[in-house]
């Protein structure tokens, strides 16, 4: 049921965005890509701010983490590292998966940390704090903002290239059109852009793996290396992760380094402190 809900929600949002792009194209012509870029960028920023507040409740139940030892440890660690944190929530991820996870979402007053109930069940409080130290590392290193800006820039370049090619008769003719059709130009561009997207994906994955190492190093620098390693091991077990993926497969598809590589890097960072 949840997969169907997610599919139809994605279909709805994607349809709205595509309709907006088509209407902007019809109304503005040559520079439609600029306006479309603005619309998509605004939507991306809006979702980054309010995803957890507006979208997550459609699929999961979120409740504030109750007062107690775990909340105190999280708040104390955040305070010690100069990280302002008020909103801490627990999500019922166990109703669909056994995977344990935690993540930060939003910015400014909408910033919140979300813990899966499976994470609370499987990890010790110290391990949970260590996992959150890793996430705080992403924020302190500005990884989240950098990735968002890179994504917005990538979207702008893609739309600009699309604007250069969409009115080319050859694209529509290649798909059987007798004249220029926006829809045929769109389909042809998607086909042509797919290899470019794959190359960009290689770069983004490599960048993401680098950021994961940096966030791990930040956590290790806070004195929680041992708990982070033990926590990552438990998370890996619940996720049924491959400990020794083929190097080329990891290079192409992995946004996170394999567990053994992360552990080795954390131990090096910890020993150098």
Annotate the PLM regions.
Residues 3-180, 199-273:
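Polar-ligand-bearing catalytic/cofactor-coordination segments
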Residues 181-188:
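Loop-to-helix entry region at the N-terminal start of transmembrane alpha-helices
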Residues 190-202:
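Hydrophobic alpha-helical transmembrane segments of polytopic membrane proteins
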């Amino acid at each position: 049921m949840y997969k169907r809900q997610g599919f139809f929600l994605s279909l709805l949002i994607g349809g709205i965005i595509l309709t907006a792009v088509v209407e902007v194209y019809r109304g503005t012509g040559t520079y439609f890509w600029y306006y479309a870029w603005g619309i998509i960028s605004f939507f991306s920023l809006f979702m980054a701010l309010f995803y957890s507040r507006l979208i997550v409740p459609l699929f999961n139940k979120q409740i504030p983490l109750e007062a107690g030892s775990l909340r105190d440890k999280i708040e104390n660690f955040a305070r010690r590292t100069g990280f302002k944190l008020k909103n801490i929530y627990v999500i019922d991820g166990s109703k669909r998966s056994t995977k344990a996870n935690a993540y930060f979402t939003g910015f400014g007053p909408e910033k919140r940390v979300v813990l899966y109930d499976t994470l609370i069940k499987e990890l010790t409080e110290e391990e949970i704090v260590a996992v959150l130290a890793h996430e705080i590392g992403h924020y302190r290193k500005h990884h989240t903002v950098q990735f968002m800006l890179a994504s917005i820039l990538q979207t702008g370049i893609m739309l600009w290239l699309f604007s250069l090619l969409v009115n080319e008769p050859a694209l529509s003719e290649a798909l059987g059109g007798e004249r220029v059709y926006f829809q045929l130009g769109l389909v042809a561009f998607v086909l042509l852009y797919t290899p470019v997207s794959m190359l960009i994906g290689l770069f983004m994955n490599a960048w993401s793996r680098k950021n994961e190492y940096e966030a791990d190093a930040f956590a290790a620098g806070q004195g929680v290396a041992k708990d982070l390693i033990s926590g990552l091991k438990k998370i890996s077990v619940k996720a049924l992760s491959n400990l020794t993926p083929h190097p080329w497969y990891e290079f192409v598809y992995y946004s996170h380094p394999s567990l053994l590589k992360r552990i080795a890097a954390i131990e090096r960072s910890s020993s150098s402190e």
